[in-house]
């Protein structure tokens, strides 16, 4: 079978939304070539686990590669991808070069070549993300391993916004807590919460592909008994008091449900938000304070921030 490789040269800011656009268009896996992977600060903090080849990465910006089967609908699909990516400009997302190229690859090449980009990555004091095909031996007895299959949907869990959320969850989730994960995607934040011994974890996503992916990943990591994944729009219809609400989505979306988050949280509960670019940080902070939250902490990595607010 022949595959079409779509390469998009863009910015760090646009990686997450463009990756989601590609998955929603039916891409069988997404590869992110980011030169910052060669020098990321977290590698200095948590230790180098693998070696990367600089020749695989662009000099500037980020290259996103996605793979679509070659069929009669390919042209229409590609045009739809281009249009949806350009619509990100309406959300003030910098697309950079936004250069898109298309080439053809054989199934044999695709089936193995993309795996070279994915290796175990330690992203916090406790958590290490490990691709399903990698053999990995924990370095510490209290190390928590999350297995992910990048070919399923929505990336590997090593994007800065996800890393920040997991680091925040590690700090604030207590044994027995109730956690709601808004826009769960792969389910990685729900999985991390369950591994941190949260008693009740709910993950919601509007995309049925994400819901299925999250359910599969929770089973893969043997925490499905502690997580309920449902298709849902943000916090609509969610009931009961929660200890923690976590949301790794665009700032514009977060601003739409700060009132619901405040209402659902117990007194003293935490609202952990990420997916926020530096330029939107103050706007989100102001909205949270206006709603009644107290800003406890702001974490940052590259161009992204995570804001932890307390009710």
UniProtKB/Swiss-Prot annotation:
Assigned keywords, A-Z: Cytoplasm, Methyltransferase, S-adenosyl-L-methionine, Transferase
Stored SUPFAM superfamilies: S-adenosyl-L-methionine-dependent methyltransferases
GO BP annotations listed: methylation
Enzyme class at the top of the EC tree: transferase
An annotated Gene Ontology molecular function: protein-lysine N-methyltransferase activity
Catalytic activity: L-lysyl-[protein] + 3 S-adenosyl-L-methionine = N(6),N(6),N(6)-trimethyl-L-lysyl-[protein] + 3 S-adenosyl-L-homocysteine + 3 H(+)
Main location: cytoplasm
GO cellular component, one term: cytoplasm
Binding site for S-adenosyl-L-methionine: 162, 183, 205, 248
Compartment(s): Cytoplasm
Enzyme Commission number: 2.1.1.-
PANTHER family: ELECTRON TRANSFER FLAVOPROTEIN BETA SUBUNIT LYSINE METHYLTRANSFERASE
Role this protein plays: Methylates ribosomal protein L11.
Entry similarity comment: Belongs to the methyltransferase superfamily. PrmA family.
The name this protein goes by in its record: Ribosomal protein L11 methyltransferase
Organism of origin: Bacillus licheniformis (strain ATCC 14580 / DSM 13 / JCM 2505 / CCUG 7422 / NBRC 12200 / NCIMB 9375 / NCTC 10341 / NRRL NRS-1264 / Gibson 46)
Gene that specifies this protein: prmA
């Amino acid at each position: 079978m022949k595959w079409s490789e779509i390469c998009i040269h863009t910015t760090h800011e646009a990686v997450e939304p463009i990756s989601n656009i590609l998955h929603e268009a039916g891409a069988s896996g997404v590869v992110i070539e980011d030169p910052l992977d060669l020098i990321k600060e977290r590698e200095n903090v948590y230790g180098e686990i693998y070696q990367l080849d600089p020749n695989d990465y662009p000099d500037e910006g980020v290259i996103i590669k996605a793979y679509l089967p070659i069929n009669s609908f390919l042209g229409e699909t590609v045009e739809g991808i281009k249009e949806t990516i350009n619509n990100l400009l309406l959300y003030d997302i910098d697309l950079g070069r936004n250069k898109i190229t298309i080439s053809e690859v054989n199934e044999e090449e695709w089936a193995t070549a993309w795996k070279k980009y994915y290796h175990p990555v330690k992203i916090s004091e406790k958590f290490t993300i490990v691709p399903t095909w990698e053999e990995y031996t924990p370095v510490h007895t209290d190390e928590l391993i999350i297995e992910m299959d990048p070919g399923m949907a929505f990336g590997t869990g090593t994007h800065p916004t996800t890393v920040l959320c997991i680091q925040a969850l590690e700090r604030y989730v207590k044994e027995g807590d109730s956690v709601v994960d808004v826009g769960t995607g792969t389910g990685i934040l729900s999985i991390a919460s369950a591994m941190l011994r949260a008693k009740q974890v709910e993950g919601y996503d509007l995309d049925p592909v994400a819901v299925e992916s999250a359910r599969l990943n929770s089973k893969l990591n043997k925490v499905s008994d502690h997580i309920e994944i449902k298709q849902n729009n943000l916090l609509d219809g969610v009931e009961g008091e929660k200890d923690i609400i976590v949301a790794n989505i665009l700032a514009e979306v977060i601003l739409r449900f700060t009132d619901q988050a405040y209402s659902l949280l117990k007194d003293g509960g935490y609202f952990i938000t990420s997916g926020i670019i530096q330029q939107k940080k103050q706007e989100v902070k102001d909205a949270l304070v206006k709603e009644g939250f107290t800003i406890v902490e702001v974490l940052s990595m590259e161009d992204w921030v995570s804001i932890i607010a307390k009710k």
